[in-house]
Structures are given as structure tokens and as C-alpha cells.
Amino acid sequence: MRLALYEPDIPQNAGSLMRLGACLGVGIDIIEPCGFLLSDKNFRRAGMDYLKSADIRRHASWARFHEDFSASNGRLVLLTTRGDMTYSDFSFAAGDTLLVGRESAGVPQTVHTSAHARLVIPLRPGMRSLNVAQAAAMVLGEALRQTAGFPGKA
């Protein structure tokens, strides 16, 4: 299981997701360009000292990420407000990569159509979306539960 961040533009969210990945043993793919420098103090503060333990792969562009990903046997699972299936109804597999879009704009249509599945988190009427880090944590938790992928107790 991996978590991919498409051109993240809020350093605190990216840092929080990298901390989540480090703590749960889930690799993180950063698809650049980012809206901040990876040396940004807000990014480092959110990730704290967990960043040293995170499995982080940086990709210079969507095309480079997609090329690398296509060589794997995994599925690309997009979390989107325009999803066609609720995340809790989806059957996750250990080789899945969960993809979240930019906080400000989501992902372009070409990325949307490249995903093997497009999942949505149901919200109350009139609510647009959750924070990207919160949404990723919710769905990652369900994916790890389904695949028995949580790390063992220390």
C-alpha cells in the first residue's frame, strides 16, 4: 500500500501525510511540482522527526510517476469529490496506491481517467470536501483494515 500526493500545495498537509505514512509503514509518493519547498519549516514542523522514517519517493511530474507506476501490478485509487463509488464499498488490495489531489484544485481530467477507481467520501448536503490529509487518513485506515495492513503491536 502506498499514498501518492499529486502536486501538493499546503506544506502542513503534506508533512502530516508523511508522518502518517511513517507511523503506519505506508510509502509516500510526491508528484511534483509542489507548491512549497520540501525544506519549508511548516512542512518539517508537521512531519516532525518522523520524516526520517518515511519511505518517500519523489517524481518530477505526473508523466514520470505514471511511467513508474505502470510498471507495477498495483491499482491507482483516486480519492475525489467526483468519485463514482463510496470508499467503504470498495475492496482494497495490498498493492493499491491511494492518490489525493491538490488541495486547491484536485487533479486534471487526464489523471482522473488514469485511475483504476475513483472513490468518494459521503458528506452532508452542501459540504464540498474534507481536508486532504483527513480524507487520506480515513480512506487509508479502511484500506489497511481490509488488507490487514496495520503494523503489529510493539
Where are the regions a protein language model picked out?
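Post-transcriptional modification and biogenesis factors for structured RNAs
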Residues: 1-154
